[in-house]
């Protein structure tokens, strides 16, 4: 049981996954919001609610979610997107918390890419600490073009669609700057691991 929970977030291409992997090497369970988001729309009550709201055309013949069909509906219409989020987001948050509390370790990390956009602690009041991975804008831009093959214009749009660095840092208890070597990122994870283990033991 891990009742001390750290929220991990950062902008696109900031290195959230790399930092999460360093904590996993230290034996810390990491629950990924992207994975949970895919799990909650597997056949079951949440998918039933989505089909009821958007119609059975968003289901594949085998009863699974047709992600492309749903994506075309919600990305074209902000009202539809909010309707989908009203169904899925509470279920995702509840499952993240359940999985974190059930995890075996001195504490658990929940990786939430859009934590700042979702409202930070106001939306996730059960987070004991928030860790933000920060990256200079120029390096983030270069990584996006290299990693995703994005054009400079697309990279700019992808970054602009997310919270600003200031907005993320405003919700942070801890900030790791990921403009260094993998070895330095590992050292930062080890340093914070000590901090979190102590905090969890006193929790």
From Swiss-Prot:
It comes from Xanthomonas euvesicatoria pv. vesicatoria (strain 85-10) (Xanthomonas campestris pv. vesicatoria). CDD domains: DPCK. It catalyses: 3'-dephospho-CoA + ATP = ADP + CoA + H(+). It is an enzyme of class 2 (transferase). Pathway: Cofactor biosynthesis; coenzyme A biosynthesis; CoA from (R)-pantothenate: step 5/5. ATP binds at residues 13-18. Belongs to the CoaE family. Residues 5-203 form the DPCK domain. GO terms for molecular function: ATP binding; dephospho-CoA kinase activity. Pfam families: CoaE. PANTHER family: BIFUNCTIONAL COENZYME A SYNTHASE-RELATED (PTHR10695:SF46), DEPHOSPHO-COA KINASE-RELATED (PTHR10695). It is found in: Cytoplasm. Coiled coil: none annotated. It comes from the Bacteria. GO terms for cellular component: cytoplasm. InterPro entries: Depp_CoAkinase, P-loop_NTPase. Its EC number is 2.7.1.24. Catalyzes the phosphorylation of the 3'-hydroxyl group of dephosphocoenzyme A to form coenzyme A. The gene is coaE. This is Dephospho-CoA kinase.
């Amino acid at each position: 049981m891990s009742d001390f929970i750290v929220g991990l977030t950062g902008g696109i291409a900031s290195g959230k996954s790399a930092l999460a992997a360093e904590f996993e090497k230290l034996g810390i369970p990491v629950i990924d919001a992207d994975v949970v988001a895919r799990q909650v729309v597997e056949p079951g009550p949440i998918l039933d609610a989505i089909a009821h709201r958007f119609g059975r055309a968003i289901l594949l013949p085998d009863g699974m979610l047709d992600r492309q069909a749903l994506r075309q509906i919600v990305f074209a219409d902000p009202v539809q997107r909010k309707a989908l989020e009203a169904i899925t987001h509470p279920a995702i948050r509840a499952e993240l918390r359940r999985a974190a509390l059930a995890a075996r370790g001195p504490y658990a990390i929940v990786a939430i890419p859009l934590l700042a956009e979702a409202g930070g602690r106001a939306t996730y009041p059960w987070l004991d600490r928030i860790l933000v991975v920060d990256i200079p804008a120029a390096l983030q831009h270069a990584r996006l073009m290299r990693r995703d093959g994005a054009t400079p214009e697309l990279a700019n749009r992808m970054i602009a669609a997310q919270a600003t660095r200031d907005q993320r840092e405003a919700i942070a208890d801890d900030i790791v700057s990921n403009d260094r070597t993998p070895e330095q990122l590992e050292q930062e994870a080890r340093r914070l691991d000590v901090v979190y283990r102590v905090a969890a033991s006193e929790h």
